[in-house]
Structures are given as structure tokens and as C-alpha cells.
Amino acid sequence: MGIPGLLPQLKRIQKQVSLKKYMYQTLAIDGYAWLHRASCACAFELVMNKPTNKYLQFFIKRLQLLKRLKIKPYIVFDGDSLFVKNHTETRRRKKRLENEMIAKKLWSAGNRYNAMEYFQKSVDITPEMAKCIIDYCKLHSIPYIVAPFEADPQMVYLEKMGLIQGIISEDSDLLVFGCKTLITKLNDQGKALEISKDDFSALPENFPLGELSEQQFRNLVCLAGCDYTSGIWKVGVVTAMKIVKRYSEMKDILIQIERTEKLCFSKAFKQQVEFANYAFQYQRVFCPLSNQITTLNNIPKAVTNSHAEIIKIMKCIGSVVERGSGVRKDVINTKNIDHKVHEMIAKGELHPVDMASKLINRERKLKARKLFKVGLLGGESNSFNKKVEQPLVDTQDVLSERENSLDNKNASSIYMTSPAAISGTVPSIF
């Protein structure tokens, strides 16, 4: 995640802040980043497919912090992956599987302390886990959205639309997408580091990011390596800065690199750069105002009028469900997109990967599976049917008295109170 080495170069403009600074404002939250952080406490359960509410507990604790500070959260979850990111996702998936094998071997050998380290490295954050948080958000009227694809451009889009005033995330990629205010390293006391795009001009001469155009900034991260490119061997962000300051066009940069023996790049790099430029600028996002799929920035007519360019850009911004056919296709005209389907995805009702099946809460799914096994192993079918009609989890096992304080009538009214909370009953989120 992020651009290797970028944040250290921005140290001069990183400000120690308290979230009190954002009182009465709305901040976007990178949902998967919080899920990754939360998974450390329940990695064994997640990898071994056992029920757990620990990742929900983490969210509740953080949301209580924001509520005390009178900050309104807007949680953004990742959707489907992009073709342009396949190499990154494949590498990560392979590494997770390797770590899972090591973890299980260590666990079987009785070395459980070291096994936990590898369990944490093998956790795969899933839409079903996000659904658990979504159900909680619905219960407490907390704004959220599932991005059609990546959360980063979705959060930047919300910022561009004025729906949020900052983004809480650990991902420096957000700056390349155009994030104006990035809040990182948030701790349990509400302290964090703030990086503002307006402060780029205050960076030192050896890293004058404020002097670069947006295209040069994209060239820099492509050379140094990002989620969309493998980068150039031995080129970090500092060396990349020197290169882009000398040559403004990527084609000139690559020509010069080909002439030198010190640097080299893979055959696929040129195409990776082209795809990265499209992905950073025109990714699909969901507009919560119009309830329609759109793009982070408007795609130029020069691109939409070229069949060859349309084929390229679709690999970078994602295919969508076509209106009428209900089939997932490379649709460029927004009028031909089934926006109702994508609205259901954005609300967490449909699975963001297959864009068709119902998205089910992870814990609810595990409970249903357990009840199904009980029904198969014994008991009358009628009694089994009666069982599954009951709540799948006793919410008192999930929500402690401290957590239920979110519904306390004396608490800040920053959140709307649900009818269930007013009546004193809390419906099951699992």
C-alpha cells in the first residue's frame, strides 16, 4: 500500500494534530485500512474461519473516539479489484498463502507465539467482513459507501464534492489521486499526522513536490513503484524526483534510461505506466448525490472517441453492469450503465466482486453454516427451521454496555438515533 519512501520525504510538512481540529466536520475513513489494523487482534480466527467480533470492537472504539470529538465519520470500503492491479494482487495473495502455511506449521508444532505473527500476515480482508461493519453503520446511522473498485479514488471524489473535509488513511497513494488533506498515524488518543497538499510548496529543494505538475507527480511514483507499476530498479522517490525535474515527459525519461547502463526497466513497464496514468485519473467512483456511477475526473473526448484507447482505459477503471442486459461489460457511456445495481453495491446489499449475489455478513454466514450442520447431524427438520428463524447471534454477546453507550440519549446527537435504539432494543447485526 502506498508509495515506498514518499511519506518520509514529506516529513517537513507533516503536522502533529489533534482530531479536535476537525470538530463538527466530516472525515472519510479508509474502511479496509481499519480492518487491516483490527485484524491483528483476531488473525487466528479470521484465517481459520472461526467467528469473531474483535474487528467490529475495534471499529466501535474508534467511532466512539470520533463521536466524543464531535466528528462525523464517512466510512469508505473497497469494492472489486482492477485488471491493472492484477500483478499486485497476485503477489499479495501468494504471499498471504505462504504466510498461512508457515503459521499453521508453527501452530501445529506448538510454537504459537511465532505462529501469530504469520497469521497476521496471512489475513485476507473480505467484503463479508466489511458487511459486518456496514450492518453496524446502518444500525447507528453512520454514513458509509462501498466503492465500485478502489476506496482511494472514491474518498478523493467525496473530498472534491465537498462531502468530506479530510481523509483518515495510511495510504500515500491518495496524494497522487489528488487528496487535499491526508490524516495518518491516528492513535487511540485522537492524535495524528496531517499532510496538506497546500503545504507541498514548503518542501525542501531536494524534493520540490510543489513544483511538479500532476502529470510529473504521476511520473515520479510510476518510476519509484506503486500499486500499478513495478518501478525501475534502484530508483526511489528521491532519484525519481531528479529524473522528472530534468525530463518532463515519460517518453523522454525512458529514452534516456535505455541509453544508460546504470538503470533498466522491464518490457511491461511502458504499458504499466500508461495504465497507471489512466487509473490515477479516471477510476470509476459512485456519486452518493446522483446515486450513479461516474469517474474521478472526466474522461477526455480524445480517449472516448478512440476504440483502441477505450480498450486500454477499461482495464484501468473497471467494467460495470450494463443496463438492460444485466451483464458486466466495458461500458463507456454512463447512460448504458445499470446504476440501480451499482447503488445496491454501494449500499453493501450486493457483493462488489460478482455484482450479483447478496452480500452476507461474515459472522452471520458462519453462524448460519453452524446451524445448518446442526440440522444435518440431528434433530427434526421442523425444529431446525424454527432455530434459523431466531436471531443468529445474541447481540449482547457482541455489544457490551460500553459499546451501547453510542445509543445513550445523553451522548452527542451527531448521529441520528435509530427507532430501535429509542425503544431500547438493539436488533442483531450478525
From Swiss-Prot:
<feature type="binding site">
    <location>
        <position position="171"/>
    </location>
    <ligand>
        <name>Mg(2+) 2</name>
    </ligand>
</feature>
<keyword id="KW-0460">Magnesium</keyword>
<keyword id="KW-0540">Nuclease</keyword>
<dbReference type="Pfam" id="PF00867">
    <property type="entry name" value="XPG_I"/>
</dbReference>
<feature type="binding site">
    <location>
        <position position="152"/>
    </location>
    <ligand>
        <name>Mg(2+) 1</name>
    </ligand>
</feature>
<feature type="region of interest" description="N-domain">
    <location>
        <begin position="1"/>
        <end position="96"/>
    </location>
</feature>
<dbReference type="InterPro" id="IPR008918">
    <property type="entry name" value="HhH2"/>
</dbReference>
<dbReference type="GO" id="GO:0003677">
    <property type="term" value="F:DNA binding"/>
</dbReference>
<dbReference type="InterPro" id="IPR019974">
    <property type="entry name" value="XPG_CS"/>
</dbReference>
<comment type="similarity">
    <text>Belongs to the XPG/RAD2 endonuclease family.</text>
</comment>
<keyword id="KW-0255">Endonuclease</keyword>
<dbReference type="InterPro" id="IPR006085">
    <property type="entry name" value="XPG_DNA_repair_N"/>
</dbReference>
<dbReference type="InterPro" id="IPR006086">
    <property type="entry name" value="XPG-I_dom"/>
</dbReference>
<keyword id="KW-0539">Nucleus</keyword>
<feature type="region of interest" description="I-domain">
    <location>
        <begin position="114"/>
        <end position="247"/>
    </location>
</feature>
<feature type="binding site">
    <location>
        <position position="227"/>
    </location>
    <ligand>
        <name>Mg(2+) 2</name>
    </ligand>
</feature>
<keyword id="KW-0378">Hydrolase</keyword>
<keyword id="KW-0479">Metal-binding</keyword>
<dbReference type="InterPro" id="IPR006084">
    <property type="entry name" value="XPG/Rad2"/>
</dbReference>
<dbReference type="GO" id="GO:0000729">
    <property type="term" value="P:DNA double-strand break processing"/>
</dbReference>
<feature type="binding site">
    <location>
        <position position="30"/>
    </location>
    <ligand>
        <name>Mg(2+) 1</name>
    </ligand>
</feature>
<keyword id="KW-0227">DNA damage</keyword>
<dbReference type="InterPro" id="IPR036279">
    <property type="entry name" value="5-3_exonuclease_C_sf"/>
</dbReference>
<protein>
    <recommendedName>
        <fullName>DNA damage-inducible protein DIN7</fullName>
        <ecNumber>3.1.-.-</ecNumber>
    </recommendedName>
</protein>
<keyword id="KW-0234">DNA repair</keyword>
<dbReference type="GO" id="GO:0017108">
    <property type="term" value="F:5'-flap endonuclease activity"/>
</dbReference>
<dbReference type="GO" id="GO:0046872">
    <property type="term" value="F:metal ion binding"/>
</dbReference>
<dbReference type="InterPro" id="IPR044752">
    <property type="entry name" value="PIN-like_EXO1"/>
</dbReference>
<dbReference type="InterPro" id="IPR029060">
    <property type="entry name" value="PIN-like_dom_sf"/>
</dbReference>
<dbReference type="GO" id="GO:0005739">
    <property type="term" value="C:mitochondrion"/>
</dbReference>
<comment type="function">
    <text>5'-&gt;3' double-stranded DNA exonuclease.</text>
</comment>
<dbReference type="GO" id="GO:0005634">
    <property type="term" value="C:nucleus"/>
</dbReference>
<dbReference type="Pfam" id="PF00752">
    <property type="entry name" value="XPG_N"/>
</dbReference>
<dbReference type="GO" id="GO:0035312">
    <property type="term" value="F:5'-3' DNA exonuclease activity"/>
</dbReference>
<feature type="binding site">
    <location>
        <position position="78"/>
    </location>
    <ligand>
        <name>Mg(2+) 1</name>
    </ligand>
</feature>
<feature type="binding site">
    <location>
        <position position="150"/>
    </location>
    <ligand>
        <name>Mg(2+) 1</name>
    </ligand>
</feature>
<feature type="binding site">
    <location>
        <position position="173"/>
    </location>
    <ligand>
        <name>Mg(2+) 2</name>
    </ligand>
</feature>
<dbReference type="GO" id="GO:0006281">
    <property type="term" value="P:DNA repair"/>
</dbReference>
